Amino acid sequence: MQIFVKTLTGKTITLEVEPSDTIENVKAKIQDKEGIPPDQQRLIFAGKQLEDGRTLSDYNIQKESTLHLVLRLRGGMQIFVKTLTGKTITLEVEPSDTIENVKAKIQDKEGIPPDQQRLIFAGKQLEDGRTLSDYNIQKESTLHLVLRLRGGMQIFVKTLTGKTITLEVEPSDTIENVKAKIQDKEGIPPDQQRLIFAGKQLEDGRTLSDYNIQKESTLHLVLRLRGGMQIFVKTLTGKTITLEVEPSDTIENVKAKIQDKEGIPPDQQRLIFAGKQLEDGRTLSDYNIQKESTLHLVLRLRGGY
């Protein structure tokens, strides 16, 4: 059968092949036609880098399929992968390698199946289809390898419309990862998602285990209104603080924002609006607090009542 190989210069090469040809054979044919040594060739099909030992039929490459040929930079670069046991593995990679390729290299060295590997860089879990250069991973960068527990666990996410979404997660998944999974399923951008568990809004950088979220726990998904609103908080010293909030923010969330701005621990804050002391578990909309409302902040004396 015939297949096509497209180079980065836009040139298309036609090859005569068999479904049982290995990728290695195909690279040899490209060398015959174009003079490019196989060790400088990387072949991509359907977004995947093809491995030398596999056959065309393994990748479901059929007649008149088009492969993409990327030239491997001589020498590539080294990166390090640190495991939880403290062992450091050195890998030879290219900036254009996908995370999937990196996991395959780790499997070659360490025997760990890719589906049990989670790679972390700069606090972010790396996605299989992305490349090292997408994440700005450069020579001698260190990735962290976390083993994925077989099977993980299921959690539920309930929306305000009453719909319940089931997600496959790991205890070590970050809230950011969970929001990405919700985006995959429901198409809701992470920056419009707020996740609540046990009355608390969950922070992107924390993990499910940080919040003691276990299998079959239910999270609540609240959509963040674009833009939110501003409110003011006036202290006894007369100072006024401006906060960006959502009507669905809890009083607890507001106290956390005040702590971020002013350094006052939430347990020392009492918030008053319309003569009422506000309770942690309630939301701003529960108290009809609207944009540009002013709350009063009274400090709770330590040990007081």
Curated annotation (Swiss-Prot):
Q: Which GO terms describe its molecular function?
A: protein tag activity; ubiquitin protein ligase binding
Family matches, as SMART domains: UBQ
Impact upon substituting L8N? Rate of phosphorylation by an insect Pink1 is very slightly increased
Biological-process GO terms, alphabetical: adipose tissue development; energy homeostasis; fat pad development; female gonad development; female meiosis I; hypothalamus gonadotrophin-releasing hormone neuron development; male gonad development; male meiosis I
Q: Which domain of life is it from?
A: Eukaryota
Q: Mind telling me which InterPro entries this protein's record contains?
A: Ubiquitin-like_dom, Ubiquitin-like_domsf, Ubiquitin_CS, Ubiquitin_dom, Ubiquitin_ubiquitin-like
One Pfam annotation reads ubiquitin
Q: Which UniProt keywords apply?
A: ADP-ribosylation, Cytoplasm, Isopeptide bond, Membrane, Mitochondrion, Mitochondrion outer membrane, Nucleus, Phosphoprotein, Repeat, Ubl conjugation
Record's signal peptide: none
Task: State what changing Q49E does.
Answer: Rate of phosphorylation by an insect Pink1 is slightly decreased
Similarity field: Belongs to the ubiquitin family.
- What's the miscellaneous note? Ubiquitin is encoded by 4 different genes. Uba52 and Rps27a genes code for a single copy of ubiquitin fused to the ribosomal proteins eL40 and eS31, respectively. UBB and UBC genes code for a polyubiquitin precursor with exact head to tail repeats, the number of repeats differ between species and strains. For the sake of clarity sequence features are annotated only for the first chain, and are not repeated for each of the following chains.
What is the protein named?
Polyubiquitin-B
